[in-house]
């Protein structure tokens, strides 16, 4: 049975920068108010005419280049997204955009947990020998579903894309994972589908659907995150026989700096090992974990063989933790 290694990572964000000062002109808020409560100073937003597929393609190409692979090497492509350009799915469009013509492609939707869920899924395809080279992409454009008059949510979200390449190898790089879902709390974070009646006959109608803006019970989501995430990290590490201090970096979904600080405190992790890029990008949903991984690999803070914890959490409610050793081993 082949081992699984994470051999490349890439990231991409739009050029358009939306700062807290811009938002203070839209709603009653300030840079200090937003930053002190979230850690966010700015976020990147897709401009009109720009597609999520194009953004995801940049991240995917970056990951392949770092791993020394071409799109023709990819056997399977998984796109983790909640905001595809096409409701039928974005993965096929991405496959075409990057020229991965030999790859099977499908979407996986698990909101802000999506990238971790997709990595875990991809690892099983490699481990069973079904596929040898799997490209996992997390990309979202939550700006498309943001109510820019809602101060509670419009300050949080940005757009972005990140990607990682998994390959079969001799030495195991995916050490373990745990995934969870609690549908009883699904109502705490949503983009609801609303429907308008379309008359078809005297006694018959269909519906025309559209998606509303993001709604969130911030207090409940925060409570869930600071309790469930560190607990699952501890369970994952224990199952793998790894102590928290043996992990080089904790790469969590970038939702709120207070959540990151709380998890670090609970795990007794030094602040410098709890990665954060919230100040620059905000909450990019399924893109946040690969984006922060790409940053830390690029600047040398993560090197081949280092243990890293990847953790996603969000709508569903869903949460997942994956322990890996980075790089070609």
From Swiss-Prot:
InterPro entries registered for this protein in UniProt: ACP_syn_III_C (IPR013747), ACP_syn_III_N (IPR013751), FabH (IPR004655), Thiolase-like (IPR016039)
Residues at the active site: 112, 253, 283
Pfam families in the cross-refs: ACP_syn_III, ACP_syn_III_C
A single BP term in Gene Ontology: fatty acid biosynthetic process
One cellular component term from this protein's GO annotations in UniProt: cytoplasm
Pathway the protein takes part in: Lipid metabolism; fatty acid biosynthesis
Reaction equation(s) it catalyzes: malonyl-[ACP] + acetyl-CoA + H(+) = 3-oxobutanoyl-[ACP] + CO2 + CoA
GO molecular function terms listed in the Swiss-Prot or TrEMBL record: 3-oxoacyl-[acyl-carrier-protein] synthase activity; beta-ketoacyl-acyl-carrier-protein synthase III activity
Subcellular location: Cytoplasm
Annotated keywords: Acyltransferase, Cytoplasm, Fatty acid biosynthesis, Fatty acid metabolism, Lipid biosynthesis, Lipid metabolism, Multifunctional enzyme, Transferase
Primary subcellular site in the record, as a coarse category: cytoplasm
Keyword Cytoplasm applies: yes
E.C. no: 2.3.1.180
Start and end residues of each stretch annotated as ACP-binding: 254-258
Top-level EC class as recorded in UniProt: transferase
Similarity comment: Belongs to the thiolase-like superfamily. FabH family.
Annotated domain remarks: The last Arg residue of the ACP-binding site is essential for the weak association between ACP/AcpP and FabH.
Oligomeric and partner information: Homodimer.
PANTHER family for this protein: 3-OXOACYL-[ACYL-CARRIER-PROTEIN] SYNTHASE, BETA-KETOACYL-[ACYL-CARRIER-PROTEIN] SYNTHASE III, CHLOROPLASTIC
Function: Catalyzes the condensation reaction of fatty acid synthesis by the addition to an acyl acceptor of two carbons from malonyl-ACP. Catalyzes the first condensation reaction which initiates fatty acid synthesis and may therefore play a role in governing the total rate of fatty acid production. Possesses both acetoacetyl-ACP synthase and acetyl transacylase activities. Its substrate specificity determines the biosynthesis of branched-chain and/or straight-chain of fatty acids.
Name this protein carries in UniProt: Beta-ketoacyl-[acyl-carrier-protein] synthase III
Provenance organism: Gloeobacter violaceus (strain ATCC 29082 / PCC 7421)
């Amino acid at each position: 049975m082949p081992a699984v290694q994470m051999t490349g990572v890439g990231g991409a964000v739009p050029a358009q920068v939306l700062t807290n000062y811009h938002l203070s002109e839209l709603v009653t808020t300030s840079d200090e108010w937003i930053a002190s409560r979230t850690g966010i100073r700015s976020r990147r937003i897709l401009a009109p005419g720009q597609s999520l597929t194009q953004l995801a393609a940049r991240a995917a190409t970056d990951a392949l280049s770092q791993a020394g692979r071409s799109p023709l090497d990819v056997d399977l492509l998984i796109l983790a997204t909640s905001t595809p350009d096409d409701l039928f799915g974005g993965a096929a469009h991405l496959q075409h955009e990057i020229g991965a013509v030999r790859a099977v492609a499908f979407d996986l939707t698990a909101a802000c947990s999506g990238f971790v869920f997709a990595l875990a899924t991809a690892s099983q395809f490699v481990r069973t020998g079904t596929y040898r080279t799997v490209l996992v992409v997390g990309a979202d454009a939550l700006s498309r579903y943001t109510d820019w008059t809602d101060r509670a949510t419009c300050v949080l979200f940005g757009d972005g894309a990140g990607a990682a390449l998994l390959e079969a190898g001799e030495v195991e790089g995916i050490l373990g994972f745990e995934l969870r879902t609690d549908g009883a709390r699904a109502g705490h974070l949503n983009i609801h589908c609303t429907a308008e009646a379309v008359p078809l006959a005297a006694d018959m109608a269909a519906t025309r659907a559209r998606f509303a803006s993001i709604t969130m019970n911030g207090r409940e989501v925060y409570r869930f995150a600071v309790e469930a995430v560190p607990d699952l990290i501890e369970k994952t590490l224990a199952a793998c026989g790894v102590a928290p201090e043996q992990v080089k970096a904790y790469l969590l979904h970038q939702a709120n700096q207070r959540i990151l600080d709380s998890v670090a405190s609970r795990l007794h992790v030094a602040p410098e090992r709890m990665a954060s890029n919230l100040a620059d990008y905000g909450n990019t949903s399924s893109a946040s974990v690969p984006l922060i991984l790409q940053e830390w690999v690029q600047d040398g803070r993560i090197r081949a063989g280092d243990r890293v914890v990847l953790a996603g959490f969000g709508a569903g409610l869903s949460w997942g933790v994956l322990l890996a050793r980075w790089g070609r081993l």
